[in-house]
UniProtKB/Swiss-Prot annotation:
Organism of origin: Geotalea uraniireducens (strain Rf4) (Geobacter uraniireducens)
Function summary: Catalyzes the NADPH-dependent reduction of L-glutamate 5-phosphate into L-glutamate 5-semialdehyde and phosphate. The product spontaneously undergoes cyclization to form 1-pyrroline-5-carboxylate.
Residue intervals passing through the bilayer: none
Protein name listed in UniProt: Gamma-glutamyl phosphate reductase
GO terms under biological process: L-proline biosynthetic process
A GO MF label: glutamate-5-semialdehyde dehydrogenase activity
CDD domains per record: ALDH_F18-19_ProA-GPR
Length: 418
């Protein structure tokens, strides 16, 4: 068979398997995930061996040290993968939950019940742990999943998937409910994106170029997990100690993640007093500042910012900064340059905080808290599939509930429509 024919078969088999997954009880799904977790631990030497092939190939390709680190699996990381599966076991099963019920004048009782999405396609890069994490969440929510990882992790991804599939086979669950596209060619992605007959939704996780490619080529609805151009706005009434603490945490705790701070906005009324302070603090932490003309009046050591800086997701110890006249300008800047990810305001003004919450057009908006809290675990969802910057079907960190949809259920006593 050609690549196109093989991928069509993978997708068709996943569709059939999704029907069986939707019928599984919570107990059966939890038992499967526990068995999968133990299987990962038991197969640690094999996973390390397969991962070494990816690392060797990556070194020959000249991948950066950071990329190789993202690829690497060792005993500790495999244990973390297994722990992640066990964590999903502890999450409430959303499937079958009735979220609302109401009575109609004709005595019909109408409700909404959570059901699986069906078949979820996930396209991702680099980190092989995503194979186990994504599979666990999709399966717990009663879905089948088709995974296409990056070519740089092909040996690791296939090895993880086969271990998990072995446990499905032992439990009598169709292995087609968890499939990995085993082709490194770009055709593997393009053909997967054509399977609208069998795959219900595509979730891409990776860099900007991957997201754009998927959006441009997919015939299937896409839930984008786009870049994080995250902002913090220091309002005129901000407590400076709080603002400094939040900015430092948002920018420096883990600068290479999507919920790290990338652009700092400062109200003009506090620019003269706050900018020298925050510039000195961040400079001591090796953060490069790129500011507009007004910012650099009070921080001469900052580099001039360009238009590109307002769009940038640095994922590094670099921070763009701008002075704004008022709340209107701060909100306008965020809604123009932001990526619908995460924004925060530091303020003592309740009215301003509420306006910021209402008018900023992003998936997570915080008042007096670090952008680093934009995370499924931190927000109480448990494990997440990613952070959606698409308003349909889900917006923000996606937990188990977001891998389901709802259907109407209706109870009658013989009613017919007049």
């Amino acid at each position: 068979m050609t690549i196109a024919e093989k991928i069509r078969k993978i997708a068709a088999d996943a569709r059939q398997a999704s029907l069986a997954m939707a019928r599984l009880s919570s107990a059966a799904k939890n038992e499967l995930l526990m068995n999968m977790a133990m299987a990962l631990i038991n197969n640690t030497p094999h996973l390390v061996e397969e991962n070494a092939k990816d690392l060797s190939a990556g070194e020959k390709k000249g991948l950066s040290a950071a990329m190789l680190d993202r690829l690497m699996l060792d005993e500790a990381r495999i244990k973390a993968m297994a722990d992640g599966l066990r964590e999903v076991v502890g999450l409430p099963d959303p499937v079958g939950e009735v979220t609302r019920m109401w009575k109609r004048p004709n005595e019909l009782t109408v409700g909404k019940m959570r059901i699986p999405l069906g078949v979820i396609g996930i396209i991702y890069e680099s980190r092989p742990n995503v194979t186990a994490d994504a599979a666990a969440l999709c399966l717990k929510a009663g879905n089948a999943v088709v995974l296409r990882g990056g070519s740089e992790a092909i040996y690791s991804n296939v090895a993880i998937a086969r271990i998990l599939q072995d446990e499905m086979r032992k439990d009598g669950i169709p292995v087609a409910a968890l499939s990995v596209i085993p082709f490194v060619e770009r055709e593997g992605v393009t053909e997967m994106l054509k399977q609208e007959e069998f795959i219900d939704v595509i979730i891409p996780r990776g860099g900007e170029s991957l997201i754009r490619f998927v959006v441009e080529h997919s015939k299937i609805p896409v839930i984008k997990h786009y870049k994080g151009v995250c902002h913090v706005f220091v309002d005129a009434s901000a407590d400076f100690d709080m603002a400094e603490r939040i900015i430092v945490n948002s920018k420096t705790q883990r600068p290479g993640v999507c919920n790290a701070l990338e652009t700092l906005l400062i109200h003009k009324d506090v620019a003269e007093t706050f900018i020298p302070r925050i510039f000195e603090t961040l400079a001591a932490l090796k953060v490069e500042m790129r500011g507009d003309d007004c910012f650099r009046q009070f921080a001469p050591g900052a580099t001039p910012a360009t238009e590109e800086d307002w769009h940038a997701e640095y994922l590094d110890l670099i921070l763009a900064a701008r002075v704004v006249d008022d709340m209107d300008e701060a909100i306008a800047h965020i809604n123009k340059y932001g990526s619908l990810h995460t924004e925060a305001i530091i303020t003592s003004d309740y009215g301003n905080s509420q306006r910021f919450l209402r008018e900023v057009n992003s998936s997570v908006v915080l008042v007096n808290a670090s952008t680093r809290f934009s995370d499924g675990n931190q927000l109480g969802l448990g494990a997440e599939i990613g952070i959606s910057t698409t308003k349909l079907h889900s917006f923000g960190p996606m937990g188990l509930e977001d891998l389901t949809t709802t259907k109407f259920i209706v109870y009658g006593e013989g009613q017919v429509r007049p």
